[in-house]
């Protein structure tokens, strides 16, 4: 190889793990001799059925012979979520906060409500934007995302607790006309194939995107229906399987 050819750049990295095998520290040596260091802290909580290992803090630093500069820090606090079975519980995020190097809050998410499966049903970002999630299929999939409405407003529009929808499997009739009952909100709806994935997504403007799958559960196309009733293909997938 000629001397002036570019040689492969080697970047030394180190990984450290805690006693449970989780990554606790990752460092990368820069060309100027400084290092970028990511540190991870976890906590253990007894969830009734077993021990939960939960991320509680993350920091990103620049270190060197004469420096140790904090660039970013994230923290997570947790609250207890009680399942439908009174003997079961688990811990779910309550507040997720991101700080810059000076300790100033850059972003905060508050998880104010959850369903019996531990899914978040209300998230507030930076004390302002409310997003409500309605779940179905026994808590497996979100069936609606609602922006610019509070948990109580959505509950009034539904005529029931938003979290209660999670325990239904099929489409809940209370979702019909929800956008009209929340005119200032942005409501998105989702339906699902039992053994594949999302089958439809209806945007706040009422336009619906449909998703079709083959017998193996692979997405073959997504489309909308035009005003003339014809399909408007958005994505079309062809799969070529070798040795099958």
Predicted regions and their residues:
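Beta-strand elements of repeat-based all-beta scaffolds
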Residues: 1-16, 21-125, 129-203, 207-244
């Amino acid at each position: 190889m000629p001397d002036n050819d570019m040689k492969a750049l080697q970047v030394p990295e180190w990984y450290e793990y805690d006693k449970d095998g989780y990554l606790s520290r990752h460092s990368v040596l820069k060309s100027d001799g400084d290092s970028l260091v990511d540190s991870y802290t976890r906590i253990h909580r007894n969830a009734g059925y077993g021990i939960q290992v939960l991320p509680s803090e993350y920091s990103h630093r620049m270190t060197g012979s004469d420096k140790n500069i904090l660039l970013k820090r994230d923290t997570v606090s947790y609250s207890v979520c009680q399942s439908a079975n009174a003997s079961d519980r688990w811990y779910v995020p309550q507040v997720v906060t991101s700080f810059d190097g000076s300790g100033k809050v850059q972003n905060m998410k508050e998880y104010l409500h959850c369903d019996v499966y531990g899914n978040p049903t209300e998230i507030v970002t930076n004390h302002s934007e409310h997003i409500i999630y309605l779940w179905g299929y026994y808590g497996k999939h979100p069936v609606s995302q609602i922006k610019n409405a509070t948990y109580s407003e959505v509950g009034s529009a539904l005529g029931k607790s938003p979290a209660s929808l999670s325990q239904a499997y099929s489409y809940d009739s209370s979702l019909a006309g929800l956008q009209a009952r929340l005119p200032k909100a942005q409501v998105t709806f989702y339906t699902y194939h039992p053994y594949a994935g999302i089958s439809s997504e209806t945007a706040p403007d009422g336009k619906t995107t449909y998703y079709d799958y083959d017998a193996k559960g692979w997405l073959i196309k997504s489309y909308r229906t035009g005003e003339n009733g014809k399909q408007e293909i958005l994505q079309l997938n062809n799969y070529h399987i070798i040795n099958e």
